Amino acid sequence: KGIVQEFVASHLDDATAAQLTPAALLTHLNTRLLSYGSDRHVTLICMIVDTEHAVLQWSVAGHLPSPILYTQGRAQFLTGQGQPAGLFEHAVFNDEQMPLPEVFSLSLFSDGVFDVMPEQHLITSEAALPKLITTAKGDYAAAVECLGLANCSNMPDDIAMLVLSRNLA
């Protein structure tokens, strides 16, 4: 967290601040993690939501599952893949970009979500996520319900979910 904040803060005064991209942040994070020589790495997705221009930019560093965009009654994974940050000196992170629809939700999960899904295998659990978000109509509370977490007394300790939405009914 501190590494990314430091990088962003150091570029806010520069003319390049407007050029700051998710891939640039991941590249910096990768370099810094490698410089520690600790054999530590992270998987993550770096996103910039530009509400003024209705644009979403993102870059992936080995995170699974991919974010899911729900709009017009349909959910689909966002594109993009990349290596975890902190493992490879020459890791390449790519920027992806798309216009944001007027009505949408964007769901992000930690890999702990797979522990609460009924499917037996990772690939089938991952494939079921867009269907789950479609059933939930992109709504956070409905997704929690669909995952069986609404009244869960034995909550897995490694599950996180974030839903960003705009004009969702």
Regions of interest found by a model, annotated:
Residues 48-51, 99-102, 167:
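Extracellular and analogous surface-interaction loops
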Residues 1-19, 76, 89, 100-155, ...:
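Active-site-proximal, acidic helix/loop segment immediately C-terminal to a metal-coordinating Asp/Glu
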Residues 1-79, 93, 149-153, 157, ...:
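Catalytic core of PPM/PP2C metal-dependent serine/threonine phosphatase domains
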Residues 62, 82, 112:
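A short beta-strand motif that forms part of the nucleic acid-binding face
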Residues 159-161, 168-169:
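Intrinsically disordered, glycine/charged-rich C-terminal tails and inter-domain linkers
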